[in-house]
Regions:
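Conserved phosphate/anionic-ligand binding catalytic regions in large, soluble enzymes, centered on
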Residues: 8-26
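Non-transmembrane, aqueous-exposed alpha-helical and coiled segments at domain scale
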Residues: 32-41, 101
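Protein-protein interaction/assembly regions in multi-subunit complexes
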Residues: 25, 67-70, 75-76, 84-86, ...
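A conserved regulatory-domain signal marking ACT and ACT-like small-molecule sensing domains
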Residues: 91-94, 118-225
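A structural-propensity feature for long, helix-poor, extended segments
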Residues: 41, 45-84
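Short, hydrophobic/aliphatic alpha-helical segments
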Residues: 1-10, 40-42
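Contiguous domain-boundary segments centered on the initiation and propagation of an alpha-helix
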Residues: 66-116
């Protein structure tokens, strides 16, 4: 435990779980969509559903979808900012089985029709855990730089990606492989110690068998004062 676990994050709003964590969940959805969200359906579970509006959870999630960090002074005005940005959204309640009480499910779509469904929980102190991506079970926190690689479930895809990362001297901190079924589409979630540059992400996306690569840059939040 460090001092930030005790004091919590720098943020706007009354609750690190309901506001800071919610903003990070929204921003994670935006980042992994890989484009500007134009439509969003936000579903709140448990404590998020019961007290989320009063604690500003709904505004924080929308703020994250707009690219705001937890300390952004515009968070209380996120609904107005969404209208300016052309982001159409709905917020409702959902009852999930075996989910953390501070859980949100976000379905987002960009102007080109690209879609993403993300389920994540705010676990305290502004920290989050992503539990599902497009219905596939995952587990990552956003505490590391994170690559999400969608690929055909075939021999060589994992080796190709990890070989390139090794050549770039990028150390893998954690990695998980997830799939619906053998031979279908799969997900690699790769958390790294080092920053990955935009052109390097693009190169990985061109590898055989790779469907898409999105990248969550932890440094984007670390640089916020």
């Amino acid at each position: 435990m460090d001092i930030f676990d005790i004091l919590g994050p720098v943020m706007v709003g009354p609750s690190s779980s309901h506001t800071a964590g919610a903003a990070r969940i929204g921003k994670m959805a935006r980042t992994l969509l890989g484009g500007e969200p134009m439509e969003a359906r936000i579903h709140l579970h448990g404590s998020f559903a019961e007290t989320g509006s009063g604690h500003g959870t709904d505004r924080a999630l929308v703020a994250g979808l707009l690219g705001m960090n937890p300390d952004d002074m515009r968070i209380p005005f996120a609904f107005q900012e969404a209208e300016k940005a052309g982001l159409h959204f709905t917020v409702d309640k959902i009852d999930l089985r075996d989910a953390h009480p501070n859980t949100a499910v976000i379905e987002v779509r960009d102007a080109h029709g690209k879609q993403l469904e993300l389920q994540a929980a705010s676990i305290g102190g502004g920290r989050i855990v992503v539990n599902k991506l497009d219905g596939i079970d995952v587990s990552f926190t956003g505490d590391y730089n994170t690559l999400v690689v969608r690929n055909h479930d075939e021999n060589g895809a994992l080796a190709a990606v990890t070989t390139i990362l090794s050549q770039l001297r990028i150390n893998v901190a954690n990695m998980s492989l997830c799939r619906h079924k053998r031979g279908g589409d799969a997900l690699m979630v790769i958390e790294t110690d080092q920053h990955i540059k935009t052109h390097q992400v693009s190169f990985l996306a061109e590898l055989p068998g790779i469907l898409s690569v999105t990248y969550y840059d932890k440094e984007d939040e670390d640089h916020v004062s």
